[in-house]
Regions:
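Short glycine-rich, Thr/Ser-proximal phosphate-binding strand/loop in the N-terminal lobe
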Residues: 10-48, 156-161
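A short helix-loop
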Residues: 10-11, 27, 129-133, 139-141, ...
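Short, well-ordered amphipathic alpha-helical segments that serve as non-catalytic structural scaffolds
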Residues: 31, 49-64, 247-252
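Short beta-strand-loop/turn "lid" adjacent to the catalytic site in phosphate-handling enzymes
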Residues: 59-98, 102
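Glycine-rich beta-strand-to-loop/alpha-helix junction loops that act as flexible
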Residues: 75-78, 141, 265-273
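Conserved phosphate-binding catalytic cores of ATP/NTP-utilizing and phosphoryl-transfer enzymes
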Residues: 106-136, 304
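Glycine-rich phosphate-binding/hydrolytic loop that grips phosphoryl groups
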Residues: 117-121, 290-313
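A contiguous, well-structured pocket-lining segment that forms one wall/lid of small-molecule binding clefts
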Residues: 193-264, 270-281, 285-287, 306-312
Length: 313
């Protein structure tokens, strides 16, 4: 009998449920509804939408015929596996996960949203073995721009932040640039498409770095100034994306001097940006999660459930 595990992830942006059988998996996800012009949701509203959306995600999995012989359930219970990391929206997935596990008489595992991202990224990059030795990982998303040092911890992973932004995240810069240019939130994909139409953006802004830390708020002011100065939207988009790619590349190169020989794995919505991928692949052979497993998903959570169950943890 194939051992199937179920993962649930109820983040700030997406309601997801996924199953994994040890090799392959299916993820059913749906973005939360954000009103046009708004930058995200309050926690109470996100939690309410998740509670309403989860049965639909489960039904999707059931209809595709993959939801049987579930041997364990896992859910993202918090953003990161560190003391004091908490967000009410994860309660939706965790409580339904615990209830399902109890009803099925199978183990329940609580993992972090970040651990799920790392597992999904490694699996979708075709490099699941990364999870069994130290590596460097960029998490580039709407809420975080972090460079992590990741090492195995039993069947799961332990991630420590070694660099990234001191203020707004790359995703926030991209979303704010997009909304400023009249695009919908979240704006990553649309901004990427818009930037592709630019002959050439204004000369990229060289973001100051302090070791492996950098700040993007000054960059946001530059974007506002360009847009207000009548620079065409495609060029502004290109400028924002090129600048982000450049500082991520420089930080990665600096990190590789400090941690020689470690592979670099990139995930998070911003990691699906085409320019960034080209730049990092060329500069350090970085590995990338598949775009659909780069954004929030429950796949990594289901993968971790499988690993934890298999190794009897």
């Amino acid at each position: 009998v194939t051992m199937v595990t179920l993962g649930l992830d109820t983040s700030n942006y997406t309601t997801s449920a996924a199953v994994f059988d040890g090799a392959d998996g299916v993820n059913a996800g749906r973005l939360l509804e954000v009103r046009p012009g708004q930058l995200g949701l309050r926690q109470s509203e996100a939690l309410f939408q998740h509670v309403k959306a989860l049965p639909g995600r489960m039904a999707e999995l059931a209809e595709s015929g993959v939801l049987r012989d579930v041997a364990a359930v896992a859910a993202s219970a918090r953003p990161r596996a560190v003391e004091g990391s908490y967000m009410p929206c994860f309660l939706a997935g965790e409580s339904q996960g615990r209830a399902l596990a109890a009803a099925l008489g199978v183990p329940f595992f609580a993992v972090s949203h970040q651990q799920g991202h790392l597992a999904a990224a490694a699996w979708s990059a075709g490099r699941m073995e990364l999870l069994d030795a130290p590596f460097l990982a960029w998490h580039l998303s709407g809420g975080t721009t972090e460079l992590l040092y990741v090492q195995p911890e039993g069947a799961n992973v332990k991630a420590g932040r070694i660099g990234g932004t001191a203020d707004i995240s790359a995703g926030q810069l991209i979303d704010r640039t997009g909304v400023l240019l009249g695009l919908d939130f979240p704006a990553g994909r649309a901004l990427d498409a818009l930037a592709a139409g630019a002959e050439k953006g204004p000369k990229r802004f060289k973001v100051k770095m302090d070791g492996l830390e950098f700040s993007l708020s000054g960059m946001e002011n530059q974007v506002r100034a360009l847009a207000a100065g009548g620079v065409e939207p495609a060029a502004v988009a290109r400028f924002a994306l090129d600048t982000v790619s450049d500082v991520v590349r420089r930080t990665t190169e600096e990190a590789r001097k400090r941690y020689p020989g470690l592979p670099v794995l990139c995930s998070g919505g911003v990691a699906s940006n085409s320019g960034l991928r080209q730049m990092l692949t060329a500069s350090c052979g970085a590995l990338f999660a598949e775009p659909r497993y780069s954004t929030d998903n429950a796949m990594g959570v289901a993968i971790l459930a499988h690993r934890l169950l298999e190794r009897g943890e």
